[in-house]
Amino acid sequence: MNIKLDKVSARHPAAKRDAAAALRGVSLEVSAGEQIAVIGPSGAGKTTLLHVLGCALPPSSGSLQLNARDPWRLPRSKLQLLRGELFLAPQVPPLPPRQRVVTSVLAGRLPHIGLWQSLRSLFYPTAIAQADAALARFDLSDKLFARVDRLSGGERQRVGLARALVTEASLLLVDEPLSALDPTRGQQAIASLTQAARERGATLVSTLHHVEMALQNFPRIIGLRDGELAFDLPAAQVTPERLQALYAQHLHELTGPAHEAFDLPAAATPPAVMHCR
């Protein structure tokens, strides 16, 4: 799916009137099949950008075009059809606790099948092999018929990502897919997502706190800070100096593997602290 943002600003409905917009004047273009990582400190507007791209939040100014169509100018019925071409994976996947994993994974197919088949699949899943194959990419085949409430936090996150592998959406929007995963599982998850998107020519946009993972796995990197576009560059051109400027006053978010990889000056590095994300 092709994407075009032209000077887009966005404000959350619950935000106070005098609060700054979560996104401010962001312009960018994405070609069908591109894979992009969005990085930046906490509160930079990364999740808001995904919500705008996923037609979950309308721009307060500027324009969004998906495949040369402004979704907010479409009739409601056509907007719903367009949303069926989008897949938004939130950081915490909304998985019903008593639901079987196979049903949760196959929920990714619901926008692409008929109403009757959707209802039937809630009780009698009909694409079990597809769900099993998706879970296998995340080493979760043994959880196919487990209940969601018996899973760990990391397993639930991987189940949410497995949905992206069964959907037929042409735009995958993935919010912080590694927040509950260790480095090994995180690399596995990113590899599975990028490979699946590449296989079917889908556009992939993912927000990431793990800067090193973003630079190693995505050819194009978008940096956001305070709701504004700081840079839009090939991964090879994202230098340590650019990262220091992007994360100024937030350098603790660069600690860990990404920090070591870029060998940031010790004088600029605050003491290491633990974060729960």
From Swiss-Prot:
E.C. number, please?
7.3.2.2
Q: Which Gene3D superfamilies match?
A: P-loop containing nucleotide triphosphate hydrolases
Q: Which residues cross the membrane?
A: none
Functional summary from the UniProt entry:
Part of the ABC transporter complex PhnCDE involved in phosphonates import. Responsible for energy coupling to the transport system.
Main subcellular localisation: membrane
Q: Where in the cell is it found?
A: Cell inner membrane
What residues does ATP bind to?
A: G40, P41, S42, G43, A44, G45, K46, T47
Summarize the subunit comment.
The complex is composed of two ATP-binding proteins (PhnC), two transmembrane proteins (PhnE) and a solute-binding protein (PhnD).
To which protein family does this belong?
Answer: Belongs to the ABC transporter superfamily. Phosphonates importer (TC 3.A.1.9.1) family.
Q: Tell me the ranges covered by the ABC transporter domain, including all copies.
A: 3-251
One GO cellular component term of this record is: plasma membrane
Task: List, in alphabetical order, the Gene Ontology terms for molecular function in this entry.
Answer: ABC-type phosphonate transporter activity; ATP binding; ATP hydrolysis activity
Membrane topology of the entry: Peripheral membrane protein
Known catalytic reactions: phosphonate(out) + ATP + H2O = phosphonate(in) + ADP + phosphate + H(+)
The record's section on InterPro entries has: AAA+_ATPase, ABC_transporter-like_ATP-bd, ABC_transporter-like_CS, P-loop_NTPase
Q: What is this protein called?
A: Phosphonates import ATP-binding protein PhnC
What keyword terms does UniProt attach to this protein? ATP-binding, Cell inner membrane, Cell membrane, Membrane, Nucleotide-binding, Phosphonate transport, Translocase, Transport
